[in-house]
């Protein structure tokens, strides 16, 4: 029997970037099931169409827009088409991310460093610059950072550094966008999605990760979606500038 969810987001309009699969799709689905109208976005039209169809099959009001977050015109289209259809924006989840290389930082090519910064940090800032005039009073911005942001090392070192930057960006924008918009972040632990398959695809590595968590398991997209829904809702109306770590008890101090 499916758990009945509260309708905390009734009447809200939510945009989630990179939301056709994995954590992004999980968040979009949860928002929709809690009553929000959701805007799905991703780089490929086929993926957007498939995700929208899945959401609509569950009775969710879903709208899809192709958006590569590093493309300025795509970002503007995402904002403009959402406002044209719904008249407002209440919730923004910046989920798009890239990890094009597992090289050590001092061996990383400049093009890789540029892409990591552009997709993981800069694109979210530019997107919010476009969205800010349309955000409703009481709106919520959520960055998806990572447990790797607290201890950037190994194959995720430079990726982790960009996620550390999001911890600071959350604090900075919470101050800049207050009091009308709250800005928070979710820091997922290890979740077995396609994006993380280079790590979680190995049973040996998975077991090692599970041993490091107090709850002895990997995270799920549902775990991350529940955290995002809380931060998007009025249940967190007195919370801003914070990062909610959802990592089963893995160490999370800078």
Swiss-Prot record:
PROSITE patterns, per database record: ADH_SHORT
Molecular functions (GO terms): oxidoreductase activity
Subcellular location, principal: other
Residues the entry annotates as binding NADP(+): 15-39
InterPro entries tied to this protein: NAD(P)-bd_dom_sf, Sc_DH/Rdtase_CS, SDR_fam
Keyword set includes Oxidoreductase: yes
One GO cellular component term: cytosol
One annotated GO biological process: response to indolebutyric acid
Motif (Microbody targeting signal): 252-254
Binding site for substrate: 146
Pfam hit, one: adh_short_C2
Residue numbers annotated as active site: 159 (proton acceptor)
NCBIfam families: PRK07231.1
Function: Involved with IBR3 and IBR10 in the peroxisomal beta-oxidation of indole-3-butyric acid (IBA) to form indole-3-acetic acid (IAA), a biologically active auxin. May be responsible for catalyzing the dehydrogenation step in the conversion of IBA. May be involved in the peroxisomal activation of 2,4-dichlorophenoxybutyric acid (2,4-DB), a precursor of active auxins that inhibit root growth.
Protein name, as recorded: Short-chain dehydrogenase/reductase SDRA
Protein source organism: Arabidopsis thaliana (Mouse-ear cress)
Gene for this chain: SDRA
